[in-house]
Amino acid sequence: MKRSAFLACAVATLALAACNKKEQQGSAPAVNDTVKITQANPPPGGNWSDVVNETAAGYLMGNPSAKVKLVEIGALTCPHCREFDEKGVPVLIEKYVKSGQVSWEFRPYLLHGLDLPANLIARCNGTKSFFPLARALYKDQADWIAKISAVPEAQLEQVQNLPINQQFVELAKLAGLQDWAAARGVSLEKSNQCLRDENEVNQLVQLSSDVSTQYPDFPGTPSFIINGAMLKETASWEKLQPQLDEALK
């Protein structure tokens, strides 16, 4: 099996069940945007970027009642998403999120077989750790993708023959993600548990599948939504920032 085919397989195998389910039920329901609020008051010093809540579809940083609600649909293996994280996110947080005027929600999308183990690790240490881990994964993206790219085809084929919940542990090991996570406070024992969590895996696959159902014009990653409206031709901070400014008027 070619490398690209295998690395898509981890997503495709699980997505098949979600697709079949949607065919039986008709269209999938829209994502519930309810935020599971654990803190809705300004933190000490008024820095809203310290407030993170889990949502039905991802994680939200900032004021849940912000005037402008920004949603990013991103993939942790996506180089353009990494570029947005590098160039746009620092300004987004400092200028817009901290004040409480804008909230930023990250919703995962699965482009590549490695997106599943990467997301499972980013979610592994709880709500407060999600953004630091996800941003660190973007920073080191080239390294862990290079490691999996160097794995011989025969070894990848052996991984493919493992049960699904073991495949993600092995993919994470081959990409160096478990050692990477351990250096950032996610123990080997904990990452093993998270990587074998079939409920989390199924949830990530379903959330990714639901994106194209809820947003038929979804153009790929990264994509951005402001107050419920998908933005067109907006895949960079340079394109996004003027639209944030306009929404704040």
Language-model segment annotations:
Residues 110-220, 225-229, 233-238, 242-249:
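Cysteine-centric redox/oxidoreductase cores and disulfide-bonded domains
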